[in-house]
A protein has these predicted regions:
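Beta-propeller blade termini and top-face loops
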Residues: 1-382
Length: 382
């Protein structure tokens, strides 16, 4: 918790929740806080579910918990009647070669007494659900949306404050790779203007019945969207390519490129002189290389950095005899050899085709999402 605008922070407990999906604050009683905890991603644990504090985070009480395998994927609260609180429970476990996402024990839970007691909402919602997003309309809190991974549909709407729901969309694209994205936003001033946050960004202006893709000029894989409640034409988005802002209600977008938000998986350094080069693999932004310094009066510029290969950049190996020859690796054990002088590339993966999306049983070799590659310190050809 920060009380000085983010300059300093104080730990408030719940250390074993490991992954927290959402923090919700009662708009009429600011000391009442709800924490939606997903819990451990790789195994069961008991510190998951909904925890509530009534003293600004000094102490916590677990108010919604079903078992050690179901955690909270999302939460929201009715802005006019904050006694109505929603929590979406989800079973998710990562395994060495697969994962578990969803079951019939998960689903949407609703409280009408400020989180003290909860009931599972079943009217109109599918039984078998994966990750869920739940959002209450601020312009009309009787309207509640739920987006989920499910065979029966993807978007559901309630017009009675979440007592019952009806399916409004079966569009699967709005929950593309649902276990990884699945988020939802409702325009604070228009209950029928709905944004689906997924691998692509989607907009509905008819209450979720139809969607169209927007923001085609920005990077894909969206993880965050914020709509200014005072001026809904101003919208901020966060995706694997960085941060962008719209000032015209999502018609056009401007990238905010004056600060660094890149995430390196792995870095390297070579032995060239007089200045060695550094580089590495970036999350969903390829593999890059650039000088550690130069003799130019303005120092290192963006143009000094060169992209070696595409995809989710992970490990990189430089030839010790020729610093312009690289082996770079992207998701699923895909390895590319690149000559930066000629810009020639050749796929040299042990597996001749991409592993993305293929059943594990059909693959000759199996590779982690992030598969290390190393070169021999004794033989430059190995």
């Amino acid at each position: 918790k920060s009380t000085d605008g983010g300059k300093t922070w104080r730990h408030l407990g719940l250390h074993d929740t490991r992954h927290i999906s959402r923090i919700v604050i009662n708009p009429k009683e600011r000391k009442t806080i709800y924490v939606g905890a997903l819990g451990h991603a790789y195994g069961p644990n008991r510190q998951r579910g909904v925890c509530m504090s009534q003293d600004g985070g000094q102490s916590w009480k677990k108010v919604l918990y079903t078992d050690e395998r179901h955690g909270v994927a999302d939460m929201d609260i009715n802005p006019e009647n904050p006694n109505i609180v929603f929590a979406a429970l989800w079973r998710f476990e990562r395994k060495p070669w697969t994962f578990i996402s969803g079951d019939e024990q998960g689903g949407l839970y609703r409280s009408i007494d400020g989180g003290l007691n909860w009931l599972k909402v079943t009217a109109g919602l599918p039984k078998l659900v994966g990750r869920m997003a739940v959002k209450v309309s601020h312009s009309n809190p009787s309207v509640v949306y739920v987006m989920t991974e499910a065979k029966d549909g993807t978007l559901y709407r309630s017009d009675d404050s979440g007592v019952t729901f009806r399916r409004v969309s079966k569009e699967v694209e709005i929950v593309s790779r649902g276990f990884y994205y699945t988020d939802l936003r409702v325009d604070p001033q228009d209950e029928n203007r709905v944004y689906a946050v997924s691998s692509r960004l989607w907009l509905s202006i008819d209450g979720g019945k139809t969607f169209k893709r927007i923001s085609k000029q920005t990077h894909v894989d969206y993880h965050a969207l914020w709509i200014d409640p005072r001026d809904t034409s101003r919208i901020w988005q966060g995706q694997d390519g960085g941060i962008a802002v719209s000032y015209d209600r999502a018609r056009t977008w401007d990238y905010i490129n004056n600060f660094t938000v890149a995430q390196f998986y792995q870095i390297y350094a070579d032995n060239r002189e007089p200045f060695y080069y550094v580089g590495g693999g970036l999350q969903d932004n390829g593999t890059w290389s650039g000088p550690s310094r130069n003799r130019e009066p303005f120092g290192i510029m963006n143009d000094d950095w060169r992209m070696i290969s595409f995809g989710d950049g992970f490990h990189i190996v430089v030839n010790p005899d020729d610093p312009e020859l690289f082996l770079s690796e992207s998701q699923g054990g895909n390895v590319v050899r690149t000559n930066m002088r000629t810009r020639e590339q050749q796929v040299v993966s042990p597996q001749p085709r991409r592993a993305d999306g293929d059943p594990v049983s059909e693959l000759k070799y199996r590779f982690n999402w992030n598969t290390p590659i190393v070169s021999s310190p004794h033989d430059s050809q190995t």
